[in-house]
Amino acid sequence: MSTFGYRRGLSKYESIDEDELLASLSPEELKELERELEDIEPDRNLPVGLRQKSLTEKTPTGNFSREALMAYWEKESQKLLEKERLGECGKVAEEDKEESEEELIFTESNSEVSEEVCTEDEEESQEEEEDSEEEEDSEEEEETTEATKHINGTVSYNSVNTDNSKPKTFKSQIENINLTNGNSGRTQRNSESPAAIHPCGNPTVIEDALEKIRNNDPDTTEVNLNNIENITTQTLSRFAEALKENTVVKTFSLANTHADDAAAIAIADMLKVNEHITSVNVESNFITGKGILAIMRALQHNTVLTELRFHNQRHIMGSQVEMEIVKLLKENTTLLRLGYHFELPGPRMSMTSILTRNMDKQRQKRMQEQKQQEGHDGGAALRTKVWQRGTPGSSPYASPRQSPWSSPKVSKKVHTGRSRPPSPVAPPPPPPPPPLPPHMLPPPPPPPAPPLPEKKLITRNIAEVIKQQESAQRALQNGQRKKKGKKVKKQPNNILKEIKNSLRSVQEKKMEDSSRPSTPQRSVHENLMEAIRGSSIRQLRRVEVPEALR
């Protein structure tokens, strides 16, 4: 009866025209209907993350571009794939393989037990997990296809229909687009290869740098291969071979490049021949003591290298290698900077003294060159001065101007026959007056007063005063006769004591005061007890007892 009533209720909706009903709906009602239909039956061709529409009515505050996000994810995934291909993630892959092998061994050993314990419920749960994994794989494939759509810019999600034949046509469209876009997948990989080859950020292109070194390019004064981890030992050896004949490169850096002893030996052979490189950096590599000692032996034939860095190697050098390094570098006089921390104090101090000696020699050489240059310049200056003395120099003052008026003419004196009259002769001096009589002479002047005795000023030369006092004491001691068994007390002068006391420093006075034993201070009780011990009964006298004590 219930089903019959339900069908009777549905029969009244069969006569309704759907087109008229949809035409009568407003735009808002149509949007709401679309939302309801999407929730009831979502589009299976869309990935799971895009099936649910945004329910927020607010406008977005930031700029969000889904196409840019998908393109970024695509680039990152390609970079990861490229790293795996180049061996960046080799260690992680090996660890995963080891873990998987252990799991396989564990499952094989316990397979018999697991088969017995396994029940029907567990089998059903395993089947459900497999189904869910298959669904996730299909969803991931759909996401990748959506990413390719947005990158190529030819397919949109609005054009996706619910037909079953659509996936096949979609795949064919993608293949045609990739083939007819003008740039195939190979060119796309090549365009992204520089970023994938050097994920560390080093912009050096290995082949171009090697070609420039071989051609002796004048602009290439530094070769920087730092942090390029996918470079091989053969490539580093090729760089060392190319640098043997190069005369321009001054700095060669290959830190953190996984270089080993073979690369170090190639660098040592290069340093024996090259006389232009001044700095080598091989820090953070896999070089052992053998490779480092090979480089140190090469420095015995190299007189140009001033800086060498080989710290932070994978293997520890050890005390024997450090001692050998110091022994080999004793005869080197050009190395100024060594980038390595010695573990032993002995080699460390020896290496410090060697580097200090080399820096001092370089300074002396530089000073000598400056003196020679100044000497050449001084000799040339002396020659120019002597040459300038022989030539008349120009006056610093300007020449006087000519007067606008003509100078007066001086008439010449004509000597005639007439002689001039003689000049008058001076009269003779008068005779001296006669001497006066004795009673008319003036009294003689009084005799001059005797000169006052000069007061001897006190000199402040303390040393002279001390010498005088000591000489006086010696004279007194020599003049007096010493008596046997008697000591003569020396009573120095007060002035000498004051002078000696003034010459002593404050510290000496404090030391003298502290060296003297301090005088003991007795209390009243001690004085009383000492008096009682020293007294006797005869010395005591009778004393009346006071009334308060009676």
UniProtKB/Swiss-Prot annotation:
Residues 524-543 form the WH2 domain. The modification Phosphoserine is found at residues 11, 15, 24, 407. One of its GO terms (cellular component) is actin filament. Residues 91-147 form a coiled coil. SUPFAM superfamilies: RNI-like. It is found in: Cytoplasm, Myofibril, Sarcomere; Cytoplasm, Myofibril; Cytoplasm, Myofibril, Sarcomere, M line; Cytoplasm, Cytoskeleton. InterPro entries: LRR_dom_sf (IPR032675), TMOD (IPR004934). Transmembrane segments: none annotated. Residues 84-202, 359-527 are annotated as: Disordered. Belongs to the tropomodulin family. This is Leiomodin-2. It comes from Mus musculus (Mouse). The lineage of its organism: Eukaryota, Metazoa, Chordata, Craniata, Vertebrata.
